[in-house]
Amino acid sequence: RVMVTLFTRPRRFGKTLNMSMMKYFFEIENTEENKKLFDGLAISNKEYMKEQGQYPVIFISFRNIEEENWEDCYFEIKNIISRTYNEFEFLRGTLNQSELAEFDSIWLKKEKADWKGSLKNLTRYLYKYYDRKKVVVLIDEYDTPIIQSYQEKYYKKLISFFKRFYGDVMKDNEYLQFGIMTGILRIAKEGIFSGLNNLKVNTIFSEKYSEYYGLTEEEVLEAVKYYDMEYEMQDIRKWYDGYQFGKSEVYNPWSIINFLNERELKAYWIGVSGNSMINDLLSKGDRHIVENLEKLFNEEIIYKVVRDYTEYKFDSSDIWELFLYSGYLTIAGEKQGEEYPLRLPNKEIQSFFRKIFIEKFIGNYD
């Protein structure tokens, strides 16, 4: 069994929804109530149902941590960890004196608390409370604060914290059943994953689970029929389809849901996808980058070296990988030697290039 899996997909492609689903499936609390969520679904008559409700689950999301300095970022991280401890306040009555002091120092956000070791300690308390049941750890949007820290220049301090925080809980932790992390990018190996030799990375290139992030053609057709909007299907494909994940072609789910709600073909995803890192790297780019952007805007295919399991180093040479992993580009066919063919996935992204990239950056190089 792979102990830790990292799923990297663009923003708003279902990562958090899948993590929430796993939380409710595996969680040992409210087992019978949670089981009802899966009644009548495909998994309900599979052997996997014996795993339902069998494990303590810790679910943490870092999706909203986008602070301008390390002090504020660290403050928010501690708030998240403290709130997580608060969910498990019931453990306090079963802890010995030393463990209770550890627990309360985090719960009450004391000055010299062991924040780096706090997540592993929580798995230990849960393991003990549930009579040696190992713990499932779910970390959502792990890279949001890391990307922000690079832009705001406190990257080294943040990496120093997370290297131990994740290393303690995900590596050689006898209390861990398995861990799942999600994000957009895999951060460079000398960063937080340097010690995790048990890490399996599932990316947009991976065939396994490829259809479970984004919506398939069949799923979109079913939704469109439900809303009596089949007549829009051709335009829906042009606007929101076109992403290639593994062997699956998928639609942008955020855009589809918003389109069905508003019944208007327009760009929904680009306002929530996070563009500041891309803008930062583009501002450091050269004319060659802009010429490639022009080709893409004109619906041409460009060929670029893309590392399948990229370890992003926040360098302008990685800009095409950032475009690809963030959802602004997609694979346009088979690999040619060392290079992948890349294209814009759909009209929604084309409108983004028109409004932001072409208008803002072409003038800088004339």
Predicted regions and their residues:
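Phosphate-binding site recognition
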Residues: 1-366
